């Protein structure tokens, strides 16, 4: 790990981390906002701002260190050409331990809507005994599609947590949580985009104290161009976690809504994004599907394979409903556990995710933000309603997949 610690800081009570790759255009802005929040709300504590970088060739680190702040700064980076947000955060966790900090948070380097209040809302609950605080945002209705169609409904339906932004990227945590994360086995995809769902799912498993903060509007760089690899790494990490922790799927569960422990004040303004064309997304799904499906078609039951063949291979027009999507996800997760072709299963899921995304855009294009959010909530409820579709398959499976149903 590369480190530049100009003030030779050896200990801190609070660490605010900024994982980054090529964010020279925004790092000064976000560093200044963090500094303002620390000055306003935590001036009596030793705080340090840490940029955990991927050795960005655009000189993100140099811009960070040159940004004027009252609080000291430390720059750390992966070595050579090593990439991945997860690698950044692992380095950050190690630095938090090294500094002996009890309270920490991380914010994505592309955030444009951060305010000093974010710092207060994230850090104060940790000082009151919480161990992990996740965000709640108001976002453009087409932003956060992996959250809306995979991680949120699957956590809701299978684990029973109403965790609205499990891969938001901005979160706070205690030193206990940091120790817990470091002790876990990290799957390969957690070194990249899988890190956020790794952190959230492990936080659920930990039994530590969890909460949420309402941050108001979220403005950031659109991630549509990164969805391909991002989906693969998020899905692989989450499926890996669920497959290795079957004790977390009880037969009967009560839904748990995380307490809202702070709210940022201010007018809600939704980010304007470039027009999203469902036809382009649908074409991606249609192009990817045949090869992925060919390798797995014999493993799918007729109630899944029949509609897929009709939509993708015959009509070439997609209408993947929320109800059908929940069963597709559960079916492919089941196959992920019992078949060796795990990469092919995740790639098939990706093509179907793009199909679900296109279908949802067609369904929502005349709806306002509030109406679209209701559809996301309804989809999560369908995942909960249909959880027995997965549990029934797992219950029939003998040996290592037998669930603890009591």
Predicted regions and their residues:
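Conserved donor nucleotide-binding strand/loop of the catalytic core
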Residues: 50, 61-87, 95-98
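Short beta-strand/loop segment that forms part of the nucleotide-sugar
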Residues: 18, 42-56, 78
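Short beta-strand-to-loop element that shapes/binds the nucleotide-sugar donor at the catalytic cleft/hinge
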Residues: 133-145
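Conserved donor-nucleotide/metal-binding helix-loop-beta segment in metal-dependent transferases, i.e.
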Residues: 115-136
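Short, well-formed alpha-helical segments that are part of the catalytic scaffolds
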Residues: 2-5, 23-40
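Short beta-strand-to-loop acidic/aromatic patch adjacent to the donor-nucleotide binding site
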Residues: 101-112
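Terminal low-complexity segments of carbohydrate-biosynthetic enzymes
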Residues: 236-406
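A conserved acidic beta->alpha catalytic loop
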Residues: 53-62, 111
């Amino acid at each position: 790990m590369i480190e530049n610690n100009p003030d030779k800081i050896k200990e801190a009570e609070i660490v605010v981390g900024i994982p980054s790759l090529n964010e020279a255009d925004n790092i000064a802005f976000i560093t200044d906002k963090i500094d303002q929040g620390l000055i306003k709300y935590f001036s009596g504590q030793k705080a340090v701002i840490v940029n955990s970088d991927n050795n960005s060739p655009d000189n993100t680190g140099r811009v960070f260190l040159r940004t004027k702040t009252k609080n000291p700064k430390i720059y750390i980076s992966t070595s050579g050409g090593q990439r991945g947000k997860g690698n950044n955060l692992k380095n950050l966790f190690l630095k938090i331990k090294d500094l002996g900090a009890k309270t920490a948070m991380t914010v994505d380097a592309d955030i444009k809507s951060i305010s000093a209040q974010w710092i207060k809302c994230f850090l104060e609950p940790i000082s009151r005994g919480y161990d992990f605080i996740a965000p709640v945002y108001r976002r453009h209705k087409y932003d956060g599609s992996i959250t809306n169609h995979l991680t949120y409904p699957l956590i809701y339906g299978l684990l029973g947590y109403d965790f609205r932004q499990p891969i938001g990227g901005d979160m706070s945590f205690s030193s206990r949580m940091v120790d817990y994360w470091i002790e876990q086995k990290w799957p390969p995809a957690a070194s990249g985009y899988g890190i956020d769902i790794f952190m959230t799912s492990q936080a659920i498993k930990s039994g530590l104290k969890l909460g949420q903060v309402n941050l108001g509007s979220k403005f950031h760089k659109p991630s549509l161009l990164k969805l391909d690899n991002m989906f693969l790494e998020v899905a692989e990490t989450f499926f890996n976690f669920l497959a290795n922790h079957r004790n977390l799927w009880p037969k009967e569960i009560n839904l748990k809504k995380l307490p809202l422990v702070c709210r940022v004040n201010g007018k809600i303004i939704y980010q304007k994004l470039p027009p999203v064309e469902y036809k382009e997304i649908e074409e991606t799904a249609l192009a990817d599907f045949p090869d992925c499906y060919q390798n797995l078609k014999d493993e799918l039951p007729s109630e899944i394979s029949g509609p897929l063949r009709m939509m993708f291979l015959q009509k070439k027009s997609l209408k993947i409903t929320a109800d059908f999507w929940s069963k597709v996800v559960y079916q492919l997760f089941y196959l992920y556990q019992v078949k060796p072709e795990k990469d092919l299963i995740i790639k098939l899921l990706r093509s179907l995710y793009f199909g679900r995304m296109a279908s949802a855009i067609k369904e929502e294009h005349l709806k306002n933000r509030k109406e679209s959010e209701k559809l996301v909530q309804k989809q999560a409820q369908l995942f909960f309603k249909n959880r027995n579709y997965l549990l029934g398959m797992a219950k029939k499976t003998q040996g290592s997949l037998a669930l603890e149903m009591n």
